[in-house]
Amino acid sequence: MTRRWALPLLLIAFGLFYLLPLATHGLWIPDETRYAQISQEMLLTGKWASPHFMGIRYFEKPVAGYWMIAIGQALFGDNLFGVRVASALSTGLSVVLAYLLARRLWNDPRKSLASALLYMSFTVVALQAGYANLDPQFTFWVNLSLVALWFTFDCRTTRGQVLAWVALGLACGMGFMTKGFLAWLLPVLVALPYAIWQKRLRSLLIYGGIGVLVAILISLPWALAVHSQEPDYWRFFFWHEHIRRFAGDDAQHASPWWYYLPLLVGFSVPWVLLLPAGLKQAWQQRRQNSSGFLLLWLVLPLAFFSLSKGKLPAYILPCLLPLALLMGNTLVDRLAAGKTRLLAFNGVLNLVAGLLGLLALVYFQMKKPVYVDEPQHLVLVYVLLLGWILSNLLQAMRPLTLWAAPALGSFLLVALAPAALPNSVVYNKIPDQFIIDHVAELGQAKALLSNDLGAASALAWRLRRPDVTLYNTEGEVKYGLGYEDTAARKVDLNQVQPWIAEARKQGSIGVVMRVKSSDEEHEVELLPKDAKRYEQGNIVIFIIPQSQP
């Protein structure tokens, strides 16, 4: 029964809770609008080798992730679903990998289903599936490389080992073209100690060349093409995005070594209490090949990222698949032994968290409302909170038969939460929806201007026009603006009025401003007084009319 219905049930959950919500809310700034615009620009210009952000060189990431998002927009259109579908499909494929690897490790359909369901219902995994960035894609390629690595050691035939190494090389090549050299490093971190432990180092060195060759064959054509078009690409990408980020004294997002430990606990929601039990059982079974391999996969990348100076939460997403398998193994073993107290306590913990969330919402709505004149959003919040509470109540009351109930609460949370956001968040962080309301006037403008990269990329994506001039801002495009052919894409406070005076001779100017401080209010003051003004949250749209001859 479990074997027959496992994958269909997972597929139904994927469709209902991963795919359907993709188009229910606008694009977040700055990440989603950036990736949407860069990918759309590839479709518009045909420049597939060198990434450009609103026509400005942008060398912070390779191209494969943009290609996938561009394919989504090519197939489904320049819309919210088209932008996000690559993230959803990448996460769905990682769920399939969890199922297949669990089946290979234990040949127990219950453990296969439990492992895949736990991974799929990790709240952070499900949230990433509906968010347009490169992390879900990179996570899939790393997951595929390490699943393939297990098969390279586990296969007993030469043909099976060769095919596994080919798959590993494919994953490393695509992972490298998605986010860089980490796609090569992470499998090596696991492969070397595991091969030494298993006394298979000779086999690793003999057959490993197949994976290296495949990875090179996949990535080399693009590597040569981008070097030919942009000779400085590799210098910037290697030193800025790898050495400085992970080892430099001025590393981005510097955090202490223990930064990821509480995050790992948070990332295991709604199965938090299975985390210590899963790790304990894995340590007790560490001499078994399966547990030892999964522990290496979990611990070594986690240690590497903990020791690096620059840290972001998404870096440890590849650690969650082995964690889900270890926890799924423990869960099924406990169910088989009739030990359900831990699962009941897990349900109680989630239930208490849900009740506290509900009480906090009621309190703030009475004292300082989060939702003002938006009953539809408030209803959605109550629905998702009640769904969370009821699903975890079921696990607490019937842990033996309804052990999977928290997954439903997690799915409801990630499916409904984006559509239930208060207007105060939507108006300030999702400007593309406001831009849609005025797209006719903005689309007629001969020139476009914005003081914020997130708002500018939302404008460029919605209008399918990369030619947005940046007003007194540069941020992550500082490097690209240093090129002579794009230096004019930015105007500062002293240049903006002459620029407007010249630009409005040709036609109207569409301006999207993000006004959060007195500095930005001063930027607004320098705009012409005869402009039409539309305001929503901290996003302000101006339509500056064409000047009279």
Curated annotation (Swiss-Prot):
Gene Ontology terms for molecular function: 4-amino-4-deoxy-L-arabinose transferase activity; mannosyltransferase activity
The protein's annotated pathway: Lipopolysaccharide metabolism; 4-amino-4-deoxy-beta-L-arabinose-lipid A biosynthesis
This enzyme's EC code(s): 2.4.2.43
Q: Does the keyword Zinc apply?
A: no
Entry superkingdom: Bacteria
User: Alphabetically, which GO biological process terms does the record hold?
Assistant: lipid A biosynthetic process; lipopolysaccharide biosynthetic process; protein O-linked glycosylation; response to iron(III) ion
The transmembrane segments are 9-29, 80-102, 112-132, 133-153, 176-196, 204-224, 257-277, 290-310, 312-332, 342-362, 377-397, 402-422
Keyword Plastid tagged: no
What does the record say about its membrane topology?
A: Multi-pass membrane protein
**What are the record keywords, sorted?**
Cell inner membrane, Cell membrane, Glycosyltransferase, Lipid A biosynthesis, Lipid biosynthesis, Lipid metabolism, Lipopolysaccharide biosynthesis, Membrane, Transferase, Transmembrane, Transmembrane helix
Q: Name one Pfam family in it.
A: PMT
The record lists its disulfide bonds as none
Identify the GO cellular component terms for this protein: plasma membrane
Which EC class, in a word?
transferase
Compartments in which it is found: Cell inner membrane
PANTHER family tied to this protein = MANNOSYLTRANSFERASE YKCB-RELATED, UNDECAPRENYL PHOSPHATE-ALPHA-4-AMINO-4-DEOXY-L-ARABINOSE ARABINOSYL TRANSFERASE
Quote the function comment for this protein: Catalyzes the transfer of the L-Ara4N moiety of the glycolipid undecaprenyl phosphate-alpha-L-Ara4N to lipid A. The modified arabinose is attached to lipid A and is required for resistance to polymyxin and cationic antimicrobial peptides.
Protein family (similarity comment): Belongs to the glycosyltransferase 83 family.
Protein name (record)? Undecaprenyl phosphate-alpha-4-amino-4-deoxy-L-arabinose arabinosyl transferase 1
Starting at the broadest rank, the lineage of the source organism is: Bacteria, Pseudomonadati, Pseudomonadota, Gammaproteobacteria, Pseudomonadales
